[in-house]
């Protein structure tokens, strides 16, 4: 009888774990990772609008480097305070404060996982896929679906815009390791236009 009650208690605690707490626990499994990615942008009707690829490095909290190589090269990197967006084709770099730049995107949940970040979202779970939806009064309007295994391996994510357009990102060559901190700085190249929005 005691074994039965103990098993029932364990089962109850598992059932009572919310999707948000499960996602938080999985995100906390690793302090950083590196991966390649492929990207596909789909219209609301499911037509492929664009495909791309690149690589990403994340070191929690707040450090990330997102390098898109195709179809058009660009780089998004932050040192935890300043966010640089560099577009070599137009020879311009935009500087923003990290807090301001990430307030309205659920991507911030991958990079820092602070308790207060969850205030604007509700979370549902379907296996290893967690749908992070903005609450009605939130300034965030896009839905974020993160695919993460129990061991903390992030296999990809999707962003669904209000109009139904969808961007799918699938991670390849995932390595659960802390990238070196020197990946999260940016030296502005000579001769580029600087748009400082900090």
Swiss-Prot record:
Gene3D superfamilies: Lipoprotein localisation LolA/LolB/LppX. The keyword Metal-binding does not apply. Residues 1-17 form the signal peptide. GO terms for cellular component: outer membrane-bounded periplasmic space. The keyword Ion transport does not apply. One of its GO terms (biological process) is lipoprotein transport. Its main location: periplasm. It is found in: Periplasm. Keywords: Chaperone, Periplasm, Protein transport, Signal, Transport. PANTHER family: OUTER-MEMBRANE LIPOPROTEIN CARRIER PROTEIN. Monomer. Participates in the translocation of lipoproteins from the inner membrane to the outer membrane. Only forms a complex with a lipoprotein if the residue after the N-terminal Cys is not an aspartate (The Asp acts as a targeting signal to indicate that the lipoprotein should stay in the inner membrane). HAMAP family: LolA (MF_00240). Belongs to the LolA family. This is Outer-membrane lipoprotein carrier protein. It comes from Aliivibrio fischeri (strain MJ11). The gene is lolA.
């Amino acid at each position: 009888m005691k074994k039965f009650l103990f098993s029932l208690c364990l089962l109850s605690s598992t059932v009572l774990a919310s999707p948000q707490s499960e996602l938080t626990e999985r995100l906390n499994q690793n302090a950083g990772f590196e991966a390649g990615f492929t990207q596909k942008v789909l219209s609301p009707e499911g037509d492929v609008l664009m495909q791309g690829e690149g690589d990403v490095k994340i070191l929690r909290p707040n450090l990330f480097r997102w390098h898109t190589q195709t179809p058009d090269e660009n780089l998004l990197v932050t040192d935890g305070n300043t966010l640089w967006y560099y577009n070599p084709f137009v020879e311009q770099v935009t500087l923003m404060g990290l807090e301001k730049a990430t307030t309205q995107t659920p991507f911030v949940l991958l990079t820092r996982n602070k308790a207060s970040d969850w205030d604007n979202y509700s979370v549902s779970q379907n296996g290893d896929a967690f749908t992070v939806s903005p609450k009605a009064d939130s300034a965030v309007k896009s839905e974020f679906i993160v695919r993460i295994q129990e061991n903390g391996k992030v296999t990809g994510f999707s962003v669904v815009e209000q109009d139904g357009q969808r961007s799918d990102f699938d991670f390849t060559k995932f390595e659960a390791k802390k990238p070196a901190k020197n990946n999260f700085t940016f030296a502005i190249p000579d001769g580029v236009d600087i748009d400082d929005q900090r």
